[in-house]
Amino acid sequence: MTDLAAKPGIRTVFIVSDGTGITAETFSHSILAQFEMKFRQVRIPFVDTVDKAHVAVSKINEAFHVEGMKPIVFTTLVDAEANRIVHQARATILDMFQTFIEPLERELGLKSSHAIGRFHQNADTEAYKNRIEAINFSLAHDDGQSHKNLAEADVILVGVSRSGKTPTSLYLAMQYGVKSANYPLIPDDFERGKLPTVLYEYKSKIFGLTIDPQRLSEIRNERRPGSKYAALENCRYEVNEAETLMRRESIKWLSSTHKSIEEIATTILQDIKMERDAY
């Protein structure tokens, strides 16, 4: 099948898991980022039966035959038989459980639970409910939409439009269960030289994001090409005014220009001294 073929010079990577595959995919991103080449990732989740394992092997082998190169396969499969079947694929297999769990079993003198999906909470756990609550809160308080219940916020992000506030807020909620609100800093705020009035009561929760004006202009031009909103001169003005305002108000801030969402979120958690386990 042609849709299984990667472009020349691009290696195909399969993520095979008996759960969502998010854990293996995150790990694979960290590993593959060490190599200066492009990869095409294909996730095969919920491989929790022998039949599904055979289907996964068929897809992997097809990619091998089409491309003439062994695919790279990251696996997190608890079921021994399903794992054995996948290991028969024409591929380079990187078995995360075999790599880490077996040495730990020997060191701890204990057998692991071998429970499928143990890492992620079930829908009826308290942690899962807290995470959903945080996501709903962050969505309701995105881009200054609502002033209600701001006292419940763990953090309030401020910055000019398109500086990374929304994705960071949602990442904090989804990954750490953090209730994050975010507010845009706009020309009216710059003219007054003050934060939005509603935020002063919660100033201790505020963290700022800024961004390089050139990069901001590029991002805004994707949304509103040729507009004053996206013009480089306007972006320079807004960024300068926002940074001046944050300095005046003694608000801690960082530049999102060259940082990933994960790096931004980790910095914020450290700053507000919140210790949260990732879900």
UniProtKB/Swiss-Prot annotation:
Q: PANTHER family from the xrefs? A: PYRUVATE, PHOSPHATE DIKINASE REGULATORY PROTEIN 1, CHLOROPLASTIC
Q: NCBIfam families given for it? A: PRK05339.1 (NF003742)
So what does this thing catalyse?
[pyruvate, water dikinase] + ADP = [pyruvate, water dikinase]-phosphate + AMP + H(+); [pyruvate, water dikinase]-phosphate + phosphate + H(+) = [pyruvate, water dikinase] + diphosphate
Uppermost EC category: transferase
* One Pfam family hit: Kinase-PPPase
Domain of life of the source: Bacteria
EC number(s) for this protein?
A: 2.7.11.33, 2.7.4.28
Q: Which InterPro entries match?
A: Kinase-pyrophosphorylase, PSRP
What protein does this entry describe? Putative phosphoenolpyruvate synthase regulatory protein
Identify the residues that bind ADP.
159-166
Q: What is the lineage of its organism?
A: Bacteria, Pseudomonadati, Pseudomonadota, Betaproteobacteria, Burkholderiales
Write the record's keywords in alphabetical order, separated by commas.
Kinase, Nucleotide-binding, Serine/threonine-protein kinase, Transferase
Q: Which family does it belong to?
A: Belongs to the pyruvate, phosphate/water dikinase regulatory protein family. PSRP subfamily.
Cited function:
Bifunctional serine/threonine kinase and phosphorylase involved in the regulation of the phosphoenolpyruvate synthase (PEPS) by catalyzing its phosphorylation/dephosphorylation.
- Residues forming coiled coils: none
Give a yes or no for keyword NADP in this entry.
no
The answer, when asked if Mitochondrion is one of the entry's keywords, is no
GO molecular function of the protein, one example? phosphotransferase activity, phosphate group as acceptor
